[in-house]
UniProtKB/Swiss-Prot annotation:
Family: Belongs to the RbfA family.
Keyword Cytoplasm appears in the UniProt entry: yes
Record's function text: One of several proteins that assist in the late maturation steps of the functional core of the 30S ribosomal subunit. Associates with free 30S ribosomal subunits (but not with 30S subunits that are part of 70S ribosomes or polysomes). Required for efficient processing of 16S rRNA. May interact with the 5'-terminal helix region of 16S rRNA.
GO biological process per UniProt: maturation of SSU-rRNA
GO cellular component: cytosol
Name recorded for this polypeptide: Ribosome-binding factor A
Organism: Mycoplasma pneumoniae (strain ATCC 29342 / M129 / Subtype 1)
Amino acid sequence: MASYKKERLENDIIRLINRTVIHEIYNETVKTGHVTHVKLSDDLLHVTVYLDCYNREQIDRVVGAFNQAKGVFSRVLAHNLYLAKAVQIHFVKDKAIDNAMRIESIINSLKKSKPN
């Protein structure tokens, strides 16, 4: 499959999930989360949705709430994406921000310990 088609589908999935959170989900915990990026498998059967939220302490609750509403998201994706089979959605915590903060703290500690 062409990579541009897969990239277009990933962008459509982000758009559909965000629209569903705004218009169809009434759980406030879900509304605090947002999709950072999406990874679609090569066979178009599995999609990994990376989530983040403003309050980092609640990220596990947000991922759990998204998993509870997985049926709504599956229905929306099945109706709006023209694929042979419905995709299986996997919601996971986006660790990119945590990793960036950890690297920044290491760099700052190295700068402080380095004599000038």
